[in-house]
Structures are given as C-alpha cells and as structure tokens.
Amino acid sequence: VPQAKSNKLQVRLVDGKGNVCGETSLTVSSRQWKTYKAVITAKATADTHLEIIPQSVGELNLDMISLFPQNTFKGRKNGLRKDLAQVLADIHPRFIRFPGGCVAHGDGLKNIYQWKNTVGPLEARKAQRNLWGYHQSMGLGYFEYFQFCEDIGAEPLPVLAAGVPCQNSACHGDLRGGQQGGIPMSEMGAYIQDILDLIEWANGDAKKTKWGKVRAEAGHPKPFNLKYIGIGNEDLITDIFEERFTMIFNAIKEKYPEMIVVGTVGPFNEGTDYVEGWKLADKLGIPMVDEHYYQTP
C-alpha cells in the first residue's frame, strides 16, 4: 500500500438496479501477499455482481478473488456448491472421471493438466486456461475431487495425459488438423514421476511418504484408496503416443502392480485409432479401456 498505512476495501453485492444486497469491508495493511477473508450476509435473493471499492488513495494488487458460499456440500472447506453436488450424489455414480476430456491432455504441451498445481492452499494454486477457451482457477482441484468421491461413495478415476496433448491443439474456429506432438523423451522421466506421485498422494502413508504427508496436511490423513487411474483421452494412436503410453503403463505396473490402468482407444468407437488402440491394449495387457461413443442411443 504505497500511499497509505492501511487501506480499507468495501466489498458488496449489487443487483441490476444498483441496490446493495449485502456488504462488508476489509482492511489491508500488509505490503506482502496475504490472504484476507470476510463474510457477506445477503439481504435479498437477486442476480447480483461483486464490487470491490477502495476507500482511500493508494495502490493495491489483488489476486485470487473468490465469492464462495459458506454452506457447501457436506460442509466441506472449499467444497462443492450444495445443490449441484446433490444432483450428482442423487445419481449414485459408481465412479467419477476427472478432470476428463480435452482438459486433461490440454492445448499443447505447456497446457497439459498438472495435478500438483491443483492441491495445497487455494491462493497458491496455478491457474491456467484450457482447450475450450475458458479459465481454470483450480479451486476445484484434486483434493476436492477425491473428497467429493468419498462423500458420495464413488470411485475416483483421475485421468492424466499419456505424454501427448490433444491432437486438436492450436485449432481455432473451423480450422481442423491440429497437432499431437509429445513430451520430449528427455522430460518423460519427470512426467512419469508426477503420475507416480499422484498415486502416492492418494494412497501413501501420511507419516512415511512425501506426498501422503501433503494429503494429510490438507485434511485427509487416511489414504483415499485409489484403485483406478486413466492414462490418455481420445488420443490418436500414433507411434508418438504408443511409445509414451507404454513407458507410463510399465512404470505404474512396476511400482503399483495393484493399480488398474484405464487406457484409451481413440476418439471414436470405430476407425483406425479404435483398431490400433485395441491392438495396443491387447499387446500390453491393459486391464481396461475407455471407449467413447458420440452417438444417440
């Protein structure tokens, strides 16, 4: 706060007619990054927007602004919106796939979903855009996902890129073709370790393992008992894909032989990728594959 010892912010909810439906204030006094929290109690039910108004002269840097309900599903900290989560719970799904789709393998190598950026303090998580063109705050990260699965009795099925990004990377508008590419072989060891670290984070002992301790510090000392892990999403079954998928698959089976790896057989339930995907599955002995059907029942 360069020009003031402290700076008060008015924080309020305002409807389309300019009526204030709830407000509070925050006093910012630190010159360092710091988390500030306050509670707004709504005085009406309305379609509103959030306003943050400085009350003194100065300069402020704001980051990770979040308006979040106190009453979450199962009362979980940073949990899911209660009504939407209940809809999912009422379906009684046997598993939940996350983050799923092209979000998992991303728009190019630098956009591949990194699970480690989604755990830990909310304000420290690394946000990024996704292939669909919108922003991910990572507020719903792997911890919240695993916790939700546990709360509704569903098996978690995390999906990680198979060392390649989406083949539609860099496609815009009606342009098609894209590029698949692949993580450089010199970096595959580190990428595979990230995947193994996820399994340790989910299932590792809270006192004996590095990532099990991270999970415990987030509020879940007991393992999540992860049984399934998806590798790849609707990928073209190319030499680039096969080489990297095989490396990942073998590494998982060596360290965690009990883990059920779910493979991919291309974006459709027919065609070259489907056929080649099944050939690879048979060759490696992949226990389960994820077929995708874009058809009406």
Task: Give the positions of each predicted feature.
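Extended acidic/polar, glycine-enriched regions
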Residues: 1-90
